[in-house]
């Protein structure tokens, strides 16, 4: 039987589209930014054109991608902000009532990987939270606010078209505010990064209560005639769940420690028994066959990524994924270097397999939709 992915390849030749993928968990400290960077790099290494979008006011993704280590780096980044647009300035025409239309952001190529670009974040992006929240609550009943709910989606679509992007990966802040609601509900797919701990279990439980409310709002907004006729129309609601990522746990003698394994199992059980019913009720799942073809069980765990340990500091220093660090960048010798190179190969395979799953799952959407 021809797989869903192979059937889509014929379709893809005739239809170029960008897939917007949100990495969302309102619990902080789950390595969303690190995963976004490493995954985006891997997708680009497989020939995809990828835009990393930093929507977290902390701007950690921007700092990693642009290498903010020294005073010279800071001066260079300041110059970039003076000469390039970013998430806040890109949306200013809508949110600050400027007499010009939203235009594509002039994204920054990320050094070291062809086809990988950054849409920089901005600390002031959070200033738009209250206004957007009011606009979404009133659902376009106030004419002056009708252009806001569709503005972020419009900016990302225009930017994707300018750079001929295959994927947009959205690094989101740990919150349940209006901006995250908008980003998630106007994405095509979403991933839920987690860590093996009690608070990730709580976060998934919370997400299962939040999603129905957000989905109901998005469906209403997508058919609201005022929002559909706005300068930046609110898009159709087509969000689908890709899966979860469990990460940042410790390995001893090739296996998760008992404590971490216990929390991994609790996360998977919470997904199966609490999140999955909500996903089904709100039509947020792809056909079951699509997940099965990728070897995913009912817990929807896409991959498990152990702690990067000392490699993460080197990765951030060189603005390079852990698996792509060179011998010169490792600056190590002997058994330490050998051990880290072995870990690099493990991480490379992990992210390669994850990227392949995402390509297959996201590509299946056009067939299953």
Can you say where each PLM-predicted feature lies in the sequence?
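Phosphate/oxyanion-binding active-site loops and adjacent basic polyanion-contact surfaces
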Residues: 32, 141-152, 200-204, 343-355
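Phosphate-binding loop that captures ATP/GTP phosphates
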Residues: 58-118, 223, 227
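C-terminal lobe/tail of nucleotide-utilizing enzymes
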Residues: 2-11, 225-369
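Conserved catalytic-core segment of NTP-binding enzymes
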Residues: 21, 45-48, 147-280
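Cytosolic-facing regulatory segments adjacent to core modules
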Residues: 93-112, 117-170, 176
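Walker A/P-loop phosphate-binding motif and the immediately C-terminal alpha-helix
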Residues: 17-57
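Active-site signature of alpha/beta-hydrolase-fold catalytic machinery across serine-
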Residues: 38, 42, 64, 182
């Amino acid at each position: 039987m021809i797989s869903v992915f192979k059937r889509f390849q014929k379709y893809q030749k005739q239809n170029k589209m960008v897939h917007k993928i949100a990495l969302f968990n309102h619990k902080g400290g789950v390595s969303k930014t690190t995963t976004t960077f490493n995954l985006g790099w891997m997708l680009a290494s497989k020939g995809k054109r990828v835009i990393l979008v930093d929507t977290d006011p902390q701007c950690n993704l921007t700092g990693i991608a642009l290498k903010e280590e020294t005073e010279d780096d800071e001066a260079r980044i300041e110059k970039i902000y003076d000469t390039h647009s970013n998430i806040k300035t890109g949306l200013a025409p809508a949110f600050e009532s400027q007499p010009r239309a939203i235009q594509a952001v002039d994204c920054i190529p990320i050094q070291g990987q062809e086809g990988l670009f950054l849409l920089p974040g901005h600390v002031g992006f959070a200033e738009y939270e209250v206004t957007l929240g009011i606009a979404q609550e009133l659902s376009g009943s106030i004419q002056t606010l009708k252009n806001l709910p569709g503005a972020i989606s419009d900016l990302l679509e225009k930017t994707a078209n300018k750079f001929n992007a295959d994927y947009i990966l959205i690094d989101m802040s740990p919150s349940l505010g209006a901006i995250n609601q908008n980003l998630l509900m106007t994405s095509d797919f979403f991933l839920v990064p987690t860590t093996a701990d009690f608070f990730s279990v709580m976060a998934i439980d919370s997400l299962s209560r939040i999603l129905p409310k957000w989905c109901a709002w998005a469906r209403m907004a997508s058919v609201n005639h005022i929002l559909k006729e706005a300068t930046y129309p609110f898009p159709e609601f087509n969000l689908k769940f890709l899966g979860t990522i469990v990460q940042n746990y410790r390995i001893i003698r090739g296996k998760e420690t008992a404590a971490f394994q216990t929390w991994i199992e609790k996360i998977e059980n919470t997904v199966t028994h609490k999140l999955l019913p909500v996903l089904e009720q709100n039509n947020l799942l792809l056909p079951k066959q699509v997940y099965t073809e990728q070897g995913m069980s009912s817990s929807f765990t896409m991959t498990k990524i152990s702690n990067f340990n000392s490699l993460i500091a080197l990765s951030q220093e060189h603005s390079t994924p852990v698996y792509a660090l060179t011998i010169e960048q490792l600056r190590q010798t002997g058994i330490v270097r050998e051990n880290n190179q072995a870990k690099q190969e493990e991480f490379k395979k992990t992210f390669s397999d994850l990227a392949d799953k995402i390509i297959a799952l996201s590509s299946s959407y056009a067939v299953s939709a």
